[in-house]
Amino acid sequence: FLEDRINILYKNFAIGMCLVLILLTMFLRPSVAFWVAMGIPISFGGALLLLPLLGVTINVLSTFMFIVVLGIVVDDAIIVGENVFRRRIKLKEDNFTSTVKGTMEVMLPVFFGILTTIVVFAPMLDLAGDTGPIWRTFPLTAIPILVFSLIESTTILPAHLNHAGEWFQYCLLYTSPSPRD
């Protein structure tokens, strides 16, 4: 029974990742969409490692929180990725310069965006009564995901974008509009 449930989770995660990647590719450049999508398993995986230490099990409530914060996980990576790409294309900066300056340029808004969400969930950690432990599942799930997302979007994602090099240029050739004669 447990093995079947785990297999269903894996299958749903794989389908979900494919759908997210397709959706991101529809609106972002393929290279940025790929690296943004890779932030999801990193953020979720990091949180999954912490959940047992925090006394949280994988259940309907914790799974719901993974879905709730998915948009935030993707948003901060999109902001960083697109800004790095913008500097690389519009300002003609090299990989390293566009990555460092592009990340630093948006790091503060990304940080405060995540911080405000954490602050919203934090009071639920202190709820008393019979339902207190149930409500604590929400912040104990959301906060680690958001922290790992912040770390991923400001360190791991820029490192990938910096070393994208030839892959980035290859994608650029096939995603940029061709000049008209």
Give each language-model segment a name.
Residues L21-F27, G46-L61, F111-N162:
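Hydrophobic, glycine/alanine-rich multi-pass transmembrane helices and their short helix-loop junctions
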Residues Y174-D181:
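Conserved small/polar residues in nucleotide/adenosyl-binding loops
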Residues R5, V20, A37, P41, ...:
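Residue-level signature of catalytic and energy-coupling elements of molecular machines
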Residues I8-G16, G102-G113, F138-T141, I145:
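Loop-to-transmembrane-helix entry motif
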Residues C18-G81, F85-R86, P144:
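Hydrophobic transmembrane alpha-helices and their membrane-interface caps
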Residues F1-I22, P123, I134:
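Juxtamembrane "pre-transmembrane" interface segments
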